[in-house]
Amino acid sequence: MNFLRRRFSSGDLQGEANEKEDPPNVGILNFKKGPSPSAPNSPSKSASPATIGQKLFSGTVGVKPVSKDRYKTLLVIDGQHTDWSKYFKGKKLFGDWDVKVEQAEFSELNLASNSETGTTVEIQAIRNGNKTTRSLKPDFLLIRQHVRDAKVDWRHLLLGFRYGGVPSINSLTAEFNFLDKPWVFAQLIDIQKRLSKDVFPLIDQTYFSNHEEMLNSPKFPLVVKIGHAHRGLGKIKVDNVQTLEDLASVMATMSSYATTEPFIDSKYDIHVQKIGTNYKAYLRKSIAGNWKANTGSAMLEQIPMDERFKLWADECSQLFGGLDVVSVEAIQGKDGRDHIIEVNGSSMALLGEAQEEDRRLISEMVMAKMQMMCKPAQQPLSKASSSQSITPQANGAQKPVLAASPSRQAQGRPLDTSAQATPGQARGPPSSGGLPGVSNSQTPLSNQPSHLSNPPPQPFPTSTSGPQGLPRMASKDEEDTMKNLRKTFAGIFGDV
């Protein structure tokens, strides 16, 4: 009996089945181990190539890597009196991109621009007594300093930013047009001609390319503006011909143009500003009695915005392709008449107690522009081609069967497993182990070649078998087990 127990042990039976490589025994083990796989598995492999491909695809493409460099660099060109970084703190672009604020003055910048790689800026600044140098690639510009003034001209930096295609507020095209005040005034003349002098009251101004023609000025007193300057620089009040002659002799030593306009005995200056869709208007009057209200001590008062001032700002904001930040400067004479004298861009002065609000408005406009103009380049998926080739394999389960076919053919096994399907299996969809290169839906059992119609039965259960396929499979496995037991009994009693 002990001999019979040893002979009837499952280990011996499995050993005989493995030595003979009888497919039914393999089918019994697979059937008892777990649920039916979606595609036939090779007896020597536990995972099909399709399963491996699915795991590989989901691991490489499904998980989106997080980059540490998810930020855009904003370069603010302004003095150190204002810390612009606090107005962008905590703000995000495109959902999760940070805004890195770099602030410097024009005098601290050097740059190099390439048509392919863009603009690289080097900042050499002195902070807390220490000289610091850092490099960056700006994605956006906010220009709060005058590009050109009485003693400086930073147009070479402006050209470099334009060469690298760096967007800005206002646009670099607009900033370049603001390099000469007579050029801007010429645009205002066009607006006046279109709207009439009553609607757009531009001051009467005369341009001189050099000093020679200045002596033919009409009447006095007048104001002479030499070259391009801000904050009251380059302006002089002339009361008579002798003073004008002296001024003309000084201009002979300079290669600069000049403009003249009648002197207006003013009550106050008018400052109208527009930041996006926000409007403000101020009155400014000199306390010291200086005819230049923007120099020395002055009284400032914010006044309600009327439709006339709003029209001025709207018309000027359309200059040079559009100005996001613009101000209109005017004076009102003691006769009650208004005179528009100039327009400024993004470098305009912020006045009054609303300066913090104005800076927040500018920062919000910068964020909106960056959101629109600084969209990150879409990263190409490195696994795009592999995903297209792996996905059909996982869905159709065709490639795993083909990959296992050479090894099975080398072991003397048939190529097809679906031709000898049981009647229960034939009612459901055909198995995925059909003819190579032909989809399951287009390969009915009756159309298979005759030389593949009688292969040995394959016990691999499939997920595409009909509901009656599993009982048929189980009964067939039991018959195969009984055959093995008969062979074992015959061997035992034959030896006895």
Curated annotation (Swiss-Prot):
Keyword Phosphoprotein annotated: yes
Role noted for this protein: Neuronal phosphoprotein that coats synaptic vesicles. Plays a role in the establishment of functional synaptic connections and in the regulation of their activity-dependent short-term plasticity.
Database matches in PANTHER family: SYNAPSIN
Residue ranges, compositional bias (Polar residues): 379-396, 442-453
Listed result of changing residue 36 to A: Decreased phosphorylation and more clustered distribution pattern
Domain of life: Eukaryota
Cysteines paired by S-S bonds: none
Family the UniProt entry places it in: Belongs to the synapsin family.
Residues carrying Phosphoserine: 9, 36, 42
Chain spans, region Disordered: 1-51, 377-482
Gene that produces this protein: SYN
Name used for this protein in its record: Synapsin
Protein keywords: Cell projection, Phosphoprotein, Synapse
GO cellular component terms given for this protein: cell projection; synaptic vesicle membrane
Compositional bias ranges of the Low complexity kind: 32-50, 428-441
Any Pfam family: Synapsin
Modification comment: Ser-9 is likely to be phosphorylated by CaMK1/4 and/or PKA. It is probable that the phosphorylation plays a role in short-term synaptic enhancement (STE). Ser-36 and/or Ser-42 are likely to be phosphorylated by MAPK; the phosphorylation may play a dual role in regulating both functional synapse formation and their activity-dependent short-term plasticity.
GO terms, molecular function: ATP binding; metal ion binding
Gene3D superfamilies membership: 3.40.50.20, ATP-grasp fold, A domain (3.30.1490.20), ATP-grasp fold, B domain (3.30.470.20)
BP-aspect Gene Ontology terms: neurotransmitter secretion
UniProt subcellular location: Synapse; Cell projection
Keyword Translocase: no
InterPro entries tied to this protein: ATP-grasp, ATP_grasp_subdomain_1, PreATP-grasp_dom_sf, Synapsin, Synapsin_ATP-bd_dom, Synapsin_pre-ATP-grasp_dom
